[in-house]
A protein has these predicted regions:
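C-terminal motif of bacterial Sec signal peptides marking the signal peptidase cleavage site
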Residues: 15-18
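Catalytic glycan-binding domains that act on GlcNAc-containing polysaccharides
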Residues: 21-193, 198
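Sec-dependent signal peptide recognition
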Residues: 3-12
Length: 199
């Protein structure tokens, strides 16, 4: 009986690691989706639901968490040495903070959403960018301004021109978004073909 339990535990660990590990090549959207085909289905579903392009979803996740499902902001340090508290409650693929994640769950009815799930994370990004378009009149195809709103929040968006750091980050997201867009145009036909998947 103990051997059976151990075997089940090993299988469970393998399944979890297979689902949660960072894709091997996060710079290539085709490679990401070939390795994690269900991610493609989830991203396409979010795109259809909210109108947020798949390539923008990926670019935001790459910048925010590098596709690490357990990503958190690094701890601040006291006297540059002693580990201290984290600067925010950002967590998971989307790096959503607790308050905004709570708002997302309440507004969408997705009560069981988890920041560690890719499916929920891309849906969150779709929801957020859609609200950005409504509140700030920023197109969901404008990766630069969408990321600024994502990073700074809707209230602080108007002050971004004085923030060189966030401007540089947004430029990187815009560049990565364009790269992902080009890559997806080359593999979308093969990705759209039904596949049998394990993970």
């Amino acid at each position: 009986m103990k051997i059976l339990k151990v075997n089940y535990l090993i299988i469970l660990i393998i399944l979890i690691s297979g689902c949660s590990s960072v894709p091997k090549n996060t710079a290539d959207s085709c490679s990401i989706f070939n390795e994690r085909y269900m991610w493609y289905k989830h991203a396409k579903k979010a795109e259809k639901k909210w109108g947020t392009p798949v390539y923008l979803q990926l670019a935001i996740i790459k910048m925010e968490s590098s596709f690490d499902w357990l990503a958190k902001p690094p701890r601040q340090k006291l006297f540059k040495v002693v580990p201290y508290k984290r600067p925010s409650s950002s967590f998971g693929y989307s790096q959503a903070v607790k308050g905004t994640w709570k708002q997302y769950k309440e507004e969408t009815g997705n009560k069981l959403a988890a920041r560690t799930r890719f499916k929920d994370s891309v849906d969150f990004i779709g929801w957020y960018t859609n609200k950005t378009e409504k509140i700030l009149k920023v197109s969901k195809k404008d990766a630069f301004k969408q990321y600024i709103a994502y990073h700074e929040g809707w209230g602080n968006y108007k002050n971004y021109k004085n923030n060189k750091k966030v401007i540089n980050l947004a430029k990187r997201v815009e560049k990565q978004s364009n790269i992902y867009k080009q890559q997806l145009s080359e593999c979308k036909n093969s990705l759209s073909t039904s596949k049998y998947i394990i993970f």
